[in-house]
Amino acid sequence: QLVELVVCQWKDQFVAYEENGVHYRMYEPECMGKRPLVLFLHGGGECGEDNELQLTGTLGALRLAERWSDMYIMAPQAPSGNLGMQEMFEVMKKRGNPFSADMGITPFSLKGERGWNRDYVAKVTDIIRKMISDGKVDENRVYLIGMSMGGGGVLQTISVAPDLFAAAVPICPSMNGESYANLLHLPKVPVWITSAYMDHQHSRHAFILNACNKLWQEGRTDVKFTLYTQEELAKYGIGTTEGLTSQELDAENHNSWILALHNENGILDWMISHQKNKEKC
């Protein structure tokens, strides 16, 4: 009932747009003047062209609008490449284990087949830049958050437009040859990466930690990495189902974005406390 209430209350407040091949929904605050903007990137299950699933698939964008009704919340939908979720996994299985963080596997986004490819996210950022030039958005307060494939999309988008964002939160970001390289060479944008202590993409944590260690050794104090514990996940009913196999537990733990969207450890407060060209609030 709570989920239905959130959908009914906020979904219709997201206006549908299609611009330069980008399908997106925008929550527009009633406040006058320049407002902050939060860009939300969905996961792999919400790709498509219906311009709706990115809102209803995980409710992430709706939760953000509920929390920050005085900000713009932008929720683009990544292209499907004419592949459904199961079809995508079948293609990935032919390349290797779809749940491994294999740096040798060419990700879909490199080939432009599906997801947050560089050309598409560049078009998304162009829309935001136009909103800034039109005086709608505060150029010093543009934020970025995404989950799973969208977490990898956060790293992709930062690499495409490093000057645009004040801070970002990649949640359980997919790790492949592209997203790992983007994290290794992360531009100077504050990021707080989160994931569950166990996740369905095995070795995800090892690659994230390896990249973070490199950044920390370079003096990047603006990079944070948190693994949610079993106890923290259980507070939100994640991983508590009786009789789960290890594979099923991994899959359930992948819902760790629920914690971030509930501001666990103050992660959302941390994100919006940043402003470009200013010290952290």
For each of these PLM feature ranges, what is it?
Residues Q1-L37, M71, W116, Y120, ...:
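A domain-start/cap signature at the N-terminus of enzymes
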Residues L37, G44-V121:
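Active-site machinery of serine-nucleophile hydrolases
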Residues L41-G43, S195-A196:
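The conserved beta1-alpha1 loop
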Residues E49-L53, G84-F89, Q156-T157, Y180-L183, ...:
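Short, solvent-exposed loop/turn and secondary-structure capping segments
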Residues S69, H185-V191:
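Short, proline-enriched alpha-helix->beta-strand connector loops that line the catalytic pocket
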Residues P76-Q77, I145, I171-C172, T194, ...:
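Alpha/beta-hydrolase-fold catalytic nucleophile elbow
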Residues R129-D134, E139-H185:
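Primarily recognizes the serine-hydrolase "nucleophile elbow" in alpha/beta-hydrolase
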Residues T194, M198-H200, A206-L209, W216-C281:
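C-terminal catalytic histidine-bearing segment of alpha/beta-hydrolase fold enzymes
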